[in-house]
Amino acid sequence: MKFTLSALSGLLLVIYTAVNAGEKGTVLWYAEQEAGIEPYKVRYIVSREFMRSDEGSDEGGFVLLDRAEQQIYSVVPQNRTILHIDGRGELPQVPPQLSVEIKRSIDEKVPRLAGQVPVTLELVANQELCYSAIIVPGHLEQARAALREFAQALSIQQSRTLAATPQEYQTPCFLSRYLYATDFHLKQGIPLVDWSQQGHRRELLDYQTGVELDDGLFELPDGFATIEASGR
């Protein structure tokens, strides 16, 4: 699966930057897809303190990352619940029996974005290709850092529940992707596209920097029941 030249050229045409003097954050739009379902749009709103992801509505459900406290909240208005994940803790270390390799390649023919040549990364575990990404180094750093923090928090939570995960699911790709190298691409750049061999795909459609953000987007609703994630 390739991130085509035409797709990158299209992205270059839709990128724009706000000139509002009250610059506070970045908004990104990705097309995301799981195996067997149609792609859907996801909006990521990033500030210095928070990252919110939703499907574009200020009123619907959303996922909120408190960056300083390393806490994740998944808000579901339909049943008035908030799933809480505590992302604090030590990142799990790669066990000796698991070999994790990150392969890196550059195609100079691909158009540059923000002056940088996109880089292709491949996550390989025990010689099996598990995940691929095309990233842009040194661009949209605040958003990249927030996405990495989110991935790390989920990795810590996954490590707490690993013992309850059936052994047949604990494949080298599962372990590397969700525990030991979940941020393999996010530590190097903002993803233009990432995908797995099982049908997951996420592709950057558009972004806007210098956005005046509504603080209310980062507030949890009152009166919702909080459910603690397992493992705590």
Regions found by a protein language model. Give the residues of each.
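Positively charged n-region of N-terminal signal peptides that target proteins for export
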Residues: M1-T4
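Sec/Tat signal peptide C-region and signal peptidase I cleavage site
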Residues: T17-A21
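Extended soluble regions of mature proteins
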Residues: G22-R232
